[in-house]
Amino acid sequence: ALSYSKGMGRLEFQFLNIGRKLKLRLGAKGIYPFGDAEEDDPAFFVYLKAEISYKSGSGKLVPFLNYNGGYDLNSFTSFSLENPYVAPTLAIKATEVNHYGDLGLKAYPGSGLSLKFNAHYSQSDNFPLFKRLPYDDNNQDVAYRLSNAYEVVYDSVEKMGIVTQIEMRFSEYNKISLETGYYEYKRKGDQKVWNLPSLKIDLNANFRLGKKIFFQASGHYIGDRDSVKNIPVSLIENSSGNYQTIESVGSVFSIASSITWKINDQWDLFYEGNMILSDNTSRWAYYQNQSQLHLGGIRYKFDINL
């Protein structure tokens, strides 16, 4: 059964200075967690906050630094939204984000083009990692004990990476952006970090053709990631009935698109499609999604005044 009841009190202050070139925001926040799931001696957490940016004379180059921390109250809902296959037997803890910082540069060359490049570093205690549960020989037909669900393991995790973003804005309705993030993870004791991809790519595009046709498209790529694999063995060989090893789960590449034709103020003709183009169709090992989904139809918007 779930064991969780928690809240927190929060106090925050900040100093803001906005100049023509230099923008400076400094502050801090204090958090006091409470609840029957808290330790016997709960602590008071203080996190600093800093946002600094500086515009060059032309305004086309803006170096920036963002730094903060936080105390994230996890829940079964938040875990299940990220991983719908978590078992309903989680010991839920809050995540202490001790450091979260980005240092980089924004560039605006002109003609609607903008670039962003930054280095990222974060360090968290009680960072949630999803680990595949083994097959339980004494499961008594309990659904989530058939090696088909995930538990949450908490540990200290460092995250380091490089993020690049390019955006081209042609007009108010026409733009395209591409963001790429490459990350390295470090866990206490040099243990494996499960189900976290080192490479993520996101593509988004919006276009309006004339005054009646709207087109949207997006693409998402997540790279390979490590996952726990449980191999059933005889109870004589292993008392748990499982042998645990690490496997690599293949990358996933998906695209989504939609086209809307506005016939008039109330009637729309539309098409929506989702396609997964990789051999692996799910972020989670041994779960697969439909590789293609297509929907088309006509939409009527009611004008109801109460």
Question: Which residues does each PLM region occupy?
Answer:
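Outer-membrane beta-barrel transmembrane domain signature of Gram-negative proteins
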Residues: 1-20
